[in-house]
Amino acid sequence: MLRRTFLAGLAGGTLSARLAAAGRTNFVFILADDFGWHDLACYGNPYFATPNLDRLAVQGARFTDAYAACPVCSPTRASILTGRYPVRTGVTDWIPGRPSHERGPITTPRTATEMKLEETTIAERLGPAGYRSASVGKWHLGNKGFWPIDQGFDENIGGNHSGSPPKSPKPYFGPFELPNLKAAEGEFLTEKLTQAAVDFIGRNRSDPFLLYLPHYTVHIPLGARGADVARHEAKANGRYNPVYAAMVESLDESVGRVLAAIDEAGIADRTIVFFFSDNGGLRYEGPAQKPVTDNSPLRAGKGHLYEGGIREPLIIRAPGVSKPGTVIDTPVSSVDFFPTMCAAAGLNAGDVDGVSLLPLLRGGSLRPRALFWHYPHYSNQGGEPGSAIREGDWKLIEWYEDGSLELYNLRDDIGEKTNLASTHRDKAERLHAQLVAWRKSVNALMPTPNPEWKPEAAATGK
């Protein structure tokens, strides 16, 4: 309620803010779904052709150590929009989550089933300053009443409660109906969302705007245009799925069309473009464990606290701010995007967990800090409940089932192959103490023993 009162007070100045907003920085945030750190050519993958994203990296800054605040989707999305860790928003697992008793010896806390209206989103922060805003694509942060329009966006195109793309009769293809987005038979979802984004840019070229473009692609069930799939089948090498590769190509095409629309509108010099993914790459699809992508050299993938589950590709093009072609290895998090946009718009970010990345983009540095994760759930991908901290080159994971610790030096061991917890006990103990103190400071909900767990049944599979 306090947030709503605050925003209502600001709304009285909206007209004057819009009149004063000419020339203000625009923001385009493109979010891929389940897209791996290694799924871009500019990140060293020779299999995928991503010329538009590679060009964006050449024109802007590419981050090597960027992280999602959670190894699954909904919590990271909330962190992007609020600048707050999942443990604070209460969205700590994908919505609606799964019953914990199905999996293991501990009962995990329930995740919130929506991003609360009391949270202040970046759209609500920018709106009173004269910004128009649209969410075009996947929302997955609650049922009706908690959709983008309820969270400060002026427009919602294609976003609802669902975490998956339309799949009937064919994944990603019409006919389907999403909020303010209808598709006839055979129309391709990624193209429809891209066109809606391009149209929004064209309508708002004279006003400052926030375009949040969270694509459904490359989330399963996989679906792509037949001609694109055929091209990739010809070069399939067993490590990558040709349908997935075709989806990556369509995502790259979308980025190219959005960049072209920015150029055509004549606003490239005052538009900051972000490209990011909500969690690590999905390695396998379905009960048959059909390969989807390969996250090497990172360990594991979506749903896991290892690097393959949380390290993401991040590209930011900020004309007049960053030197083209910059590569940044400072660890950053999805909680940092909210304060970055606020700083670029000349606004106070308020009480958030993230920090502005503008100093890094300008060639400077950030104050030393630790990054934190709290994922007290069993994931659909086999990930186990735990939490983690990264400080400098060091990363420590605590597993909630048995309290065991794993310590890695990521500079020397990006694949997390050698657990150093026993040989670097002082480092492990210090990082663990920091992690425990952080969890207490944010009132993290912790797992409890599972009374329904039967180890003998788990061992026999009965």
Show the residue positions of the predicted features.
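N-terminal secretory signal peptides and thylakoid transit peptides that target proteins
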Residues: 1-14
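Long, internal low-complexity/basic segments
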Residues: 7, 23-25, 32, 36-37, ...
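Loop/turn elements at helix/coil->beta-strand transitions in domains of secreted/extracellular proteins
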Residues: 24-27, 60-64, 129-133, 154, ...
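A short beta-strand-to-alpha-helix junction
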Residues: 45-50, 67-72, 109-120, 183-193, ...
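Short, structured active-site-proximal loop/turn typified by the sulfatase FGly-forming signature C/S-X-P-X-R
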Residues: 46-78, 83-88, 132-134, 154-160, ...
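Formylglycine-dependent
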Residues: 91-132, 139-211, 215-226, 230-245, ...
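Histidine-centered active-site microenvironments of extracellular/periplasmic hydrolases
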Residues: 147-152, 221-224, 260-321, 333
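C-terminal cap/loop subdomain of S1 sulfatases and analogous C-terminal strand-loop tails that border
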Residues: 155, 281-305, 322-326, 330-410, ...
